[in-house]
Amino acid sequence: MPHRSRHKKGRSSSVRPPHPTVPTWIQYTPEEVEQLAVELARRGFPPSQIGIILRDQYGIPLVKPITGKKLTKILEEHGIKQELPEDLLNLIRRALRIRKHLEEHPKDMASRRGLQLVESKIHRLIKYYKRVGKIPQDFVYNPEALSHLAT
């Protein structure tokens, strides 16, 4: 499937199984997987990084088939909740980086166009997250107010 706002086609990648089952070679119990995830989150890793660490260092391919819950749900149950979803937060950080670049290089039209594309993705995601209830209905994307997220 082609990418939105790009002239290139999408890239092929490995396909995840349609009905993932718990592999027989996994030696961790669901409680141990939850504890590992919570420990990594307390050390400051976002959910995507936690999944990669569990896959690469602990040999846990997917959390949901083992525990029956998604990783973000596990973290919420243990009191670790993000104020914004991770994908939206990453897009906001990217937009803030581009804005900072444009302050120093105001005639960089390619970056200005990139900022438009990133901010349109942000607005689409905000509409979706408001609809499903992941962010409050009165949330407004304001780059100046969200500048504390740039770190």
UniProtKB/Swiss-Prot annotation:
Residues 1-24 are annotated as: Disordered. It holds the Pfam family Ribosomal_S15. Transmembrane segments: none annotated. Residues 1-11 have a biased composition (Basic residues). One of its GO terms (molecular function) is small ribosomal subunit rRNA binding. SUPFAM superfamilies: S15/NS1 RNA-binding domain (SSF47060). One of its GO terms (biological process) is translation. Gene3D superfamilies: 4.10.860.130, S15/NS1, RNA-binding (1.10.287.10). InterPro entries: Ribosomal_uS15 (IPR000589), Ribosomal_uS15_arc_euk (IPR023029), Ribosomal_uS15_N (IPR012606), uS15_NS1_RNA-bd_sf (IPR009068). Keywords: Ribonucleoprotein, Ribosomal protein. The keyword Ribonucleoprotein applies. Belongs to the universal ribosomal protein uS15 family. Part of the 30S ribosomal subunit. This is Small ribosomal subunit protein uS15. It comes from Pyrobaculum calidifontis (strain DSM 21063 / JCM 11548 / VA1).
